[in-house]
Amino acid sequence: NSGALLWPLIWGLLLIGTQALDKEAQLRDKVFENYNINVRPARTPDQRVVVQVGMTLAHVISVSEKDEELKTKVYLEMAWNDQRLSWDPKQYGGIESLRISSSQVWTPDIVLMNNNDGNFNFALQVDVLVSPNGNVTWHPPGLYVSSCSIEVQYYPFDWQNCSMVFRSYTYGADEVTLVHPKDANGKEVTQAVIFPNTFEENGQWVIRHRSSRKNSSPNDPLYEDITFYLVIQRKPLFYIVNVIVPCILITILAIFVFYLPPDAGEKMTLSIFALLTLTVFLLLLADKVPETSLGVPIIVNYLIFTMTLVTFSVIFSVVVLNLHHRSPNTHHMPQWVKQIFIHYLPKYLCIRRPKPETPLPVAPPPRQVTSTRHADEYFIRRPENDFFLPKQERYHADPFSRDMKWFLEGPSLGLVLPRDLQSAVTAIRYLAQQLQEQEDYDTLKEDWQYVAMVVDRLFLWTFIAFTSLGTLSIFLDANFNLPPDTPFP
């Protein structure tokens, strides 16, 4: 008995479904009767077809600075009215919508005019949705590669205004007019729509503006487009970690070149190593930035600034080494060099030279030596210095040395010596002269080395000052490069 009751119910449902299919088939036959997809859905030839153009942004895939192009994944939203596709739902079983292949109905052929790959087709030809009043909505997805003029001045602390221009490829403004879509409250939607649940964030860029505007040309009344302005700002963390921080560390190495003693022999090696490393970084960046002469990226400016400083560090190191290895045999030290680099600058550069030797103690008054002078006697002049005395005895001379000194430094103009002492005195005077010359040589050579150390320290502080001020000025300038309040140019 239960089976006998179920069969009529099943047959009734099948009959209703068959009738519904028949109604939809009848509706399709009705709307496509005498339908021509090549004819605009206008009642009169001079009537313009109003097409609403909107866009849902799904993903900013990439921005190629080298090729100056923006790759995005979007859903283009188009809506218009085609009275030829209207029907009365009551006559067709209450059907409120109809899905039709886009190839079977008229479409406004809206395309991305500034595409960069020559592909004007959509990624997928989805069906259009038709309402009983003839309203047609179409949301085809697309992977667009649009041209984007890259402003490289503040790269990588930059923002870019990449526009996407949509217009009808074959129809002018007198046949098809483009307008912004409207929301449920009837208000125009003048920006690209983003659904947070489906939008994919980009790891390198963040969207700041996504407004749209209808543009027309006063010189061409048939021109009309809807342009979406995507203002995107770069996230510079990658470049800070991989480029800027290494450059700063290399600059610090170049600073320590001036702290390295010239005798170490590695000043030039370290300077040239830093210069070559910065050159490699510059070559790596050359593959990233666009080949344009309209501007120089700020990161390239910083690299050039750093390379200039490192180049000067090489030059300054050569100067320091040249000063360090000078000697009295090759160079004479001018008085102004002594005054500036030995007596004046060191106290301002935090350099203190070891204390000089303590001066000799004052000797007691010389003894009076009297003797009888003859015409044929040998006379010698009083020595002008005491360098014939041993150096260790300068401060504590023994009595014999003092007696000899008093004997030689008597008040008389000359002393009569026996002939057997003439050769001994001559040898002593020769030794004293040689010791004096050697001490003068060593003193002047040490003065040149001290001048080299002072110049090295001067270059160190100068390099630190220029590096700090230059780095701060460059990156503070980039810090003020903020996206505009309005995206429209």
UniProtKB/Swiss-Prot annotation:
One GO term describing the cellular component: acetylcholine-gated channel complex
PROSITE patterns: NEUROTR_ION_CHANNEL
GO biological process: acetylcholine receptor signaling pathway; chemical synaptic transmission; membrane depolarization; monoatomic ion transmembrane transport
Membrane topology qualifier: Multi-pass membrane protein
Signal peptide (residue range): 1-20
Key words of the record: Cell membrane, Disulfide bond, Glycoprotein, Ion channel, Ion transport, Ligand-gated ion channel, Membrane, Postsynaptic cell membrane, Receptor, Signal, Synapse, Transmembrane, Transmembrane helix, Transport
Entry's Gene Ontology molecular function annotations: acetylcholine receptor activity; acetylcholine-gated monoatomic cation-selective channel activity
Reactions listed under catalytic activity: K(+)(in) = K(+)(out); Na(+)(in) = Na(+)(out)
Cellular localization per UniProt: Postsynaptic cell membrane; Cell membrane
Extracellular-facing ranges: 21-235
Entry-listed glycosylation sites: 135, 161
Pfam families assigned to the protein according to its UniProt record, in alphabetical order: Neur_chan_LBD, Neur_chan_memb
Record field: transmembrane: 236-260, 268-286, 302-323, 458-476
Main location (coarse class): membrane
Gene3D superfamilies found in the cross-reference section: Neurotransmitter-gated ion-channel ligand-binding domain (2.70.170.10), Neurotransmitter-gated ion-channel transmembrane domain (1.20.58.390)
Domain of life of the source: Eukaryota
Cytoplasmic face of the membrane: 324-457
Disulfide bonds: 148-162
SUPFAM superfamilies: Neurotransmitter-gated ion-channel transmembrane pore, Nicotinic receptor ligand binding domain-like
Family the entry assigns: Belongs to the ligand-gated ion channel (TC 1.A.9) family. Acetylcholine receptor (TC 1.A.9.1) subfamily. Beta-1/CHRNB1 sub-subfamily.
Subunit structure: Pentamer of two alpha chains, and one each of the beta, delta, and gamma (in immature muscle) or epsilon (in mature muscle) chains.
Function: After binding acetylcholine, the AChR responds by an extensive change in conformation that affects all subunits and leads to opening of an ion-conducting channel across the plasma membrane.
NCBIfam families: LIC (TIGR00860)
Protein name: Acetylcholine receptor subunit beta
Species in which this protein is naturally found: Xenopus laevis
Gene assigned in the entry: chrnb1
